[in-house]
From Swiss-Prot:
Pfam families per the UniProt record, alphabetical: DNA_mis_repair (PF01119), HATPase_c_3 (PF13589), MutL_C (PF08676)
UniProt-listed InterPro entries: DNA_mismatch_repair_CS, DNA_mismatch_repair_MutL, DNA_mismatch_S5_2-like, HATPase_C_sf, MutL/Mlh/PMS, MutL/Mlh/Pms-like, MutL_C, MutL_C_dimsub
Cellular component GO terms, alphabetical: mismatch repair complex
Gene Ontology biological-process entries: mismatch repair
Protein's UniProt keywords contain DNA repair: yes
Membership in a protein family: Belongs to the DNA mismatch repair MutL/HexB family.
HAMAP family named in the record: DNA_mis_repair
Organism: Rhodopseudomonas palustris (strain BisA53)
Free-text function comment from the UniProt entry: This protein is involved in the repair of mismatches in DNA. It is required for dam-dependent methyl-directed DNA mismatch repair. May act as a 'molecular matchmaker', a protein that promotes the formation of a stable complex between two or more DNA-binding proteins in an ATP-dependent manner without itself being part of a final effector complex.
Top-level taxonomic group: Bacteria
Keywords on record: DNA damage, DNA repair
GO molecular-function term, one example from the UniProt record: ATP hydrolysis activity
Protein name as annotated: DNA mismatch repair protein MutL
Length: 603
């Protein structure tokens, strides 16, 4: 077959295959056009998941008659000069969207330019353009797309259900609305109730309002403002506290010069910034806005313009990590503390508790110490100190003499310890309510931060064992541990081979005290087996520190004296990131006096 020039309609349909993948792609292109036209209000309507009908109405500048006639021709655009391809400042620039849509659907455009006496309308069907006719429209542009892919029916079978396609449209509009909080958006359709986002004032407060309207009130409560700048590149936005997480990274949004993009860059940078706060299977919610010179970013690397390429991707990644780490550190405990939400409070409502039993005596309850018992009997396997008469089995009212809160302690952020319950949780009184602390999770974070600080300064202090502890493990585990012996040694854990299937532990970190060496080594080996070989040394060392901290912290079941509980609270207040343990769980929750009064019907 000889080489021949393809007809314009076929060329446009080929281009449409790249630009118009699904109804959401049409909405994206048309809303971007509206934003580029200076619209202050945009209305989006869809029917049948967008395949039957899509309508976009805006109050932008509109088009003249001459511009409208050219707009549906391929590569006709008002947004790009001859030499501006590397300095793109608009969302659209190729001039492909309208001709591509018109080649696979029925397209109708009605527009009125501010200098025109009336509006003009133009229809395109299957790539065939009809003559322009006068029309009625007060301002801006209205674009309607119907029977999407009627000219390429094979594409229809690749579309999903109407509900799924409608949700994809919703996500596109949500992203564009987050990018432009100064523009009002309305989204409606046969598949959904109308949703509106009012325009807000520029600045951080307005941006947070728009993000909260879209991401929910929970995001507003936990949002931390972040910002970092260097060499003309600015990263700013809002990140959710570590207490607000998702099972996937779909709640992470990146915008570059006002353009919503998807980039693996953000996933790795966010993971690095939140590494000390979240478990590996949880992801934070955030929206980051990168602003830079258009020459520093290439937006022309993907047909749908959903990806960009930075001239200095390493700089952008470093700024994202720095902005997030700085914000999380600056917010400290506020970003980490978990509060009691309404659902939890509802569980306390009268009627949930079982009725009291007649003739019940707390002395016969399982928690009351039996004569002759001691701390070791109550919590086997844990080394205890002298309890100095501190009876954990007694009701909390009977220990108030030991834990009476001094006025100065109540005014501290975590208050004054009142008692310990279930040998696991510390209850502290604050000026505005109470705090419940998970003693193991809290102490785990403290030990972890001490290990990191020691590693960063003069190295972790070691404790030489008079008699090396021999730990028997399977040969594969032994080999794995010995391969990482140098990394373990940097944290004060010195091990040597002790024949087949065994290692000798000669030194342990002084911070760990009497931690079970065998259990520690087994856990370390399990975690090492999950490591990616490409994982940086720093991250591997932090994983080691986190595992060691877990084994070196106060366990649930350990009875604490009042002075020990208060000392733990004070150390938490002075330690960064103490609101989460190393696995991302909260170390304490707050219950305000207002919450307590609600429980008893006082409010």
């Amino acid at each position: 077959m000889p080489v021949r020039q393809l007809p314009e309609t076929i060329v446009n349909r080929i281009a449409a295959g790249e630009v118009v993948e699904r109804p959401a792609s049409v909405v994206k292109e048309l809303v971007e056009n509206a934003l580029d036209a200076g619209a202050n209000r945009i209305e989006v309507f869809s029917d049948g998941g967008g395949r039957r009908r899509i309508a976009i109405t805006d109050d932008g500048g509109g088009m003249t008659r001459a511009d409208l006639e050219l707009a549906v021709d391929r590569h006709a655009t008002s947004k790009l000069d001859d030499e501006d391809l590397l300095a793109i400042r608009t969302l659209g620039f190729r001039g492909e969207a309208l001709p591509s849509i018109g080649s696979v659907a029925k397209l109708s455009i009605t527009t009125r330019h501010t200098e025109e006496p009336h509006a003009w309308a133009l229809a395109v069907e299957g790539g065939t353009k009809s003559p322009l006719v006068p029309a009625a429209l007060s301002q801006g542009t209205r674009v309607e797309v119907s029977d999407l892919f009627y000219a390429t029916p094979a594409r229809l079978k690749f579309l999903k259900t109407d509900r799924t396609e409608a949700e994809a449209i919703r996500e596109v509009v949500r992203r564009l609305a987050m990018a432009r909080p100064d523009v009002a958006f309305t989204l409606s359709g046969e598949e959904r109730a109308p949703v509106s986002w009012a325009a807000v004032l520029p600045g951080a407060a307005g941006r947070l309002t728009r993000l909260s309207d879209i991401l929910g009130a929970e995001f507003r409560k936990s949002a931390i403002e972040v910002r970092s700048e260097r060499d003309g590149v600015v990263v700013e936005g809002f990140a959710g506290a570590p207490s607000l997480t998702r099972a996937n990274a779909l709640g992470q949004y990146l915008f570059v010069n006002g353009r919503p993009v998807r980039d693996r860059l953000i996933i790795g940078a966010v993971r690095a910034a939140y590494a000390d706060y979240l478990p590996r299977d949880r992801h934070p919610v955030l929206a980051l806005f990168v602003t830079c010179d258009p020459h520093e970013v290439d937006a022309n690397v993907h047909p749908a313009k959903t990806e960009v390429r930075f001239r200095d991707a390493g700089l952008v990644r470093a700024l994202i990590v720095h902005a997030l780490k700085d914000g999380l550190s600056r917010e400290g405990q506020r970003s980490a503390a978990a509060s009691v939400d309404g659902a939890t409070l509802a569980a306390f409502r009268p009627g949930f508790a079982p009725p009291p039993r007649a003739n019940w005596d707390w002395r016969r309850s399982p928690s009351y110490p039996i004569a002759g018992s001691n701390a070791m009997d109550m919590a086997p396997g844990f080394a205890e100190r002298e309890q100095a008469g501190f009876d954990v089995g007694l009701p909390s009212a009977d220990v108030r003499n030991y834990a009476a809160p001094a006025a100065e302690l109540i005014d501290r952020p975590l208050g004054a310890a009142r008692t310990q319950i279930h040998e696991t949780y510390i209850v502290a009184q604050t000026r505005t309510g109470l705090v419940i602390v998970d003693q193991h999770a809290a102490h785990e974070r403290l030990v972890y931060e001490k290990l990191k600080a020691s590693m960063a300064s003069n190295g972790v202090q070691r404790q030489l064992l008079l008699i090396p502890e021999i730990v028997e493990l399977d040969e594969a585990t032994v080999e794995q541990l010995l391969d990482r012996a140098e990394e373990l040694c940097s944290f004060g854990l010195a091990i040597d081979s002790f024949g087949p299937g065994a290692v000798a532990v000669r030194e342990v970190p002084a911070l760990l005290g009497k931690a079970n060496a065998a259990s520690l080594l087994r856990d370390l080996a399990e975690h090492m087996a999950e490591w990616d070989e490409a994982l940086p040394l720093e991250r591997r060392l932090l994983h080691v520190a986190a595992t060691m901290a877990c084994h070196g912290s106060v366990r649930a079941g350990r009875i604490l004296k009042p002075e020990e509980m208060n000392a733990l609270l004070r150390e938490m207040e002075a330690t960064p990131n103490s609101g989460q343990c190393n696995h991302g769980r909260p170390t304490y929750v707050e219950l305000t006096l207002s919450d307590i009064e609600k429980l008893f019907g006082r409010r």
